[in-house]
Amino acid sequence: MARAMDNAILETILQRVRPLIGQGKVADYIPALASVEGSKLGIAICTVDGQHYQAGDAHERFSIQSISKVLSLVVAMRHYPEEEIWQRVGKDPSGSPFNSLVQLEMEQGIPRNPFINAGALVVCDMLQGRLSAPRQRMLEVVRALCGVSDITYDVTVARSEFEHSARNAAIAWLMKSFGNFHHDVPTVLQNYFHYCALKMSCMELARTFVFLANQGEAFHLDEPVVTPMQARQINALMATSGMYQNAGEFAWRVGLPAKSGVGGGIVAIVPHEMAIAVWSPELDPAGNSLAGIAALEQLTQTLGRSVY
């Protein structure tokens, strides 16, 4: 590294970005998320050799929301041949809001990528066809990746999302009309919302995703999570499509593959070195953590890290 990592660096970064708190907005279209305290701020790092660093609210669990889309893709990659996945979902950035219907209609029910809602729903539809208990299987995968046995779903958040699921249901039914959705829509929606309602901390997320920094291998697991090629492909998708319609702006400012969620979390990858997780619930207009992006920008500048 250009500079040795320690917790003091992370503490300093949080101090620098804390003035941004109050300038964003906590997600309120999901009532169960609207009550989260907007002043929360945490960051954690897990290196490929198992070193951990943290600052702020790094051990407080929150709803990971769309960060889970990476995990569902990982599970799909372990159960489906590559060609079966990518004939149903694309690999290109959408440039549209994550819950857009317009582009999906124009492109005959094939989502642009697996990290927008439509693409993630297709992936969940695929998992429904291969896994006997998709929700339990996801918990098993996440617990193994994280090394923590009590990771679970926030059922209140999952229920709240299902009760306000009209738009996601419309997306699923639209894809079904084009023949790109094969299973019962409410069942798949329930799985999808449970995945989004996983509760994890920054430290747990950094440990979970460190395999993407190490060619698909995690320091604490005996078997690879994915192949080196699959890890590279996932990182590429995160770089182009992981930050909704602001992927270009994020690449400009931060320069790392990343995936965000409207719970305020962001996971970013420094290939061959580390996974970083940040959390600040207040969002920018695109649905990304306002202070979280600023913290990652400060960190990459401090360490001199970018994939570009």
Swiss-Prot record:
Keywords: Hydrolase. It comes from the Bacteria. Gene3D superfamilies: DD-peptidase/beta-lactamase superfamily (3.40.710.10). GO terms for molecular function: glutaminase activity. Pfam families: Glutaminase (PF04960). GO terms for biological process: glutamate biosynthetic process; glutamine catabolic process. Its EC number is 3.5.1.2. SUPFAM superfamilies: beta-lactamase/transpeptidase-like. Substrate binds at S66, N117, E161, N168, Y192, Y244, V262. It catalyses: L-glutamine + H2O = L-glutamate + NH4(+). NCBIfam families: Gln_ase, PRK00971.1-1, PRK00971.1-2. Homotetramer. Belongs to the glutaminase family. This is Glutaminase. It comes from Salmonella agona (strain SL483). The gene is glsA.
